Amino acid sequence: MLDALHLFSFKCFEMLDLPLGKLTVLSGINGGGKSSVIQSLVLLAQTLDEREWSKSLLLNGPSLTLGSASDVINQTTGRRQLGLGASAGNRKVVWTFNAQDRRAMALDLSAVEVNGASLDLSGPIHWLLPEAEAGGCAIVQHLKCISWLSAERTGPRELLPLLDPQHHRQVGMRGELAAGLLHWRESDAVSERLLIEGEPPTLFHQVRARMRQFFPGCDLQILPIEGASAVSLRLRSSAKSEFQRPQNVGFGLTQLFPVLVEVLAASPGDVVIVENPEVHLHPKAQQDIGELLALIASCGVQVIVETHSDHVLNGIRLAVKGRRSVEPAQVEIHFFSRDADGASRRLSPKIDADGRLDVWPDGFFDQFDQALAALL
């Protein structure tokens, strides 16, 4: 598990040491830094995946397109340098990257520190580390296992991609690969703690069962398209209706589907990042997805969720109070805001065994109370 994220001169952050838990909640104002936290992790994962033997940070790739050095280096302190790092157990790795100029589309690896000691970068570099170090580095392995589902998810589509099964490992940043992944892995076993009683313990049946929990009567089919590298997702909203194209059912079904596939398909040791799981879900379903994410985090999968929903937060709090999933010490909650000078600021409320938070910063999921007070 990744225990912390370390950033310097990256986007809005001059310096950030961010604790990560089995379940980490990122909240706060728009433009406060939540997305930058996620992008830093995805940026490292993208580089490790696409440039295994490279000495540069890949700013523009299949997962992220961030532009040039001037777009990612903090404009106040960064000049031509930034740092990205992570901790796991008793090990901390920080990578420093330099740009030849602020228009550069990639940043060169200039230094690597492990527990504060600089490593020799004169030899071959593998996964952003000297070759002898790379294979046994747990931090690198966790970063390589990141799965990211962004807030900009694919809407209803007639056809969805079906990749080679060896490369169809994730749902895709927009969820566009979820149906294909479920097709290839339909018979995979799901963790016993996640099973819905009375349903077969396979991924396909458990995704169907979870969909019915959120949308009673819902069912799904995945149909391979003959002669094409594609599948068709069919949905119905009740047992009495016919299976239909996704365009003809509630939008929330197609938005929740990739979330469920992503979290139920994850393996222990994976890092799952979900942005705005509440999109197009009614309040009860938003609370339920919070409880499910807490349950997923108790099964060895590290979950990082970015949300604007008090219902998602309350679902997590209820899961902690009900002792059905993660322990209070395994949950990290962060609230990002801006000070008068525009610098990013973070407050981190702590949750107790009853699901209560020790502090409630102004602007932290309090809009309902503020509106109610004004109405009264």
Residue map of PLM features:
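Phosphate-coordinating catalytic segments in nucleotide- and nucleic-acid-processing enzymes
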Residues: 47-256, 262, 267, 347-376
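Pre-Walker A-like glycine/lysine-rich segment at the N-terminus of P-loop NTPase domains
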Residues: 1-49, 53-59
